[in-house]
Amino acid sequence: MENILVSPEWLNEKLSDPNLIILDASEKSNVAGKKIKYEGVRIPGARFFDLENTFSDKSSHLPHTFPSSENFIKESRQLGINNKSILVVYDNIGVYTSPRVWWMYKVMGHKQVYVLDGGLNEWVENGFKTEVAASEGEYQIGDFSGDLEKNAVDSLEDIKANLLSKKKLLIDARTRGRFNGTSPEPRDWVKNGHIPASINLPFDEVLKGSKFKSREELKAIFKSLDIEDRDLSFVCGSGLTSCIILLASELVQQNKTSVYDGSWTEWGSTDGLPIDHD
């Protein structure tokens, strides 16, 4: 059970630390259509982490898939990230894309990576300064190195094999309507439903407003799922919100965790795979 979340007060006190690097993981396209309260500003000194392009596998037809380790390391160094860097990630929705970036550095072996609980909303509403989100500058090349944790990223073949082995329990972070197949998918070429034997924990059920629920509330949620001794693989539409519930689980549990990188977009658009509807 890790110390993953930091407060605006903690971050403000750290601003003068030379090892601190703040990563703005906000999506420029806002594909999800989430409400953005504070546009065009960022936390002073924040560096834009381009999750949609630079830090996704552009050879894949799927959104947000993990880039090669080599590319991840190269682009991290371009952002000036070092092995000793203290990384704090936030986004402009509250908690949305930032857990994905936290997870990426976590599984690449970086120890000091945190999420600003509540994101830019909490920062501004606690009275801390912002700056205009200008174009990115160039940074001194960092020395970041990393090694992708074995079994942290699940492929389509891994999930197909798991249908028989049942080594991992799949937890789907999509809304109940999408999971049950009663609501349409945002990508019209993706079928409705869910992977057989997966369970549903909509990501907004671990949040209260723009922040994570308390640890006591999260403990109750995960206890109700009866998953204490299971290895867990997290699924969503495209690998973003799965990381929200993965992070929530790591605040209160000690399961082995992974993310199905292609998530429902891959499963629901691949012919011949079994699909359940509840």
Model segments located where?
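Cytosolic catalytic domains that perform sulfur/thiol-centered chemistry
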Residues: 1-278
